[in-house]
């Protein structure tokens, strides 16, 4: 069963579009957009299991230059 998550990302000021472009290139990320509101980017990612999803977030998203913080919400339905 595939695990899907919405990831809310905060970036350094003025970096949202650049960071979103980099995040789109991460394997497992199906979408990443710069948005308005309390967070700078919303991304959707999928992985075969929770462990792999965690690795994707930590190694693939949080390691992108300009990412300050992320909040991951796993889809429940």
Name each model-derived stretch.
Residues 1-77:
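A compositional/biophysical signature of low hydrophobicity enriched in polar/charged and small residues
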């Amino acid at each position: 069963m595939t695990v899907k998550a919405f990831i809310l990302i905060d970036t350094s000021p003025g970096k949202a579009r650049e960071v979103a472009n980099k995040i789109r290139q991460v394997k497992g990320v199906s979408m990443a957009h710069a948005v308005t509101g309390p967070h700078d980017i919303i991304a959707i990612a999928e992985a075969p299991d929770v462990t792999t999803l965690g690795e994707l977030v930590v190694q693939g998203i949080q390691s992108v230059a300009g990412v300050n913080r992320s909040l991951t919400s796993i889809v429940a339905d």
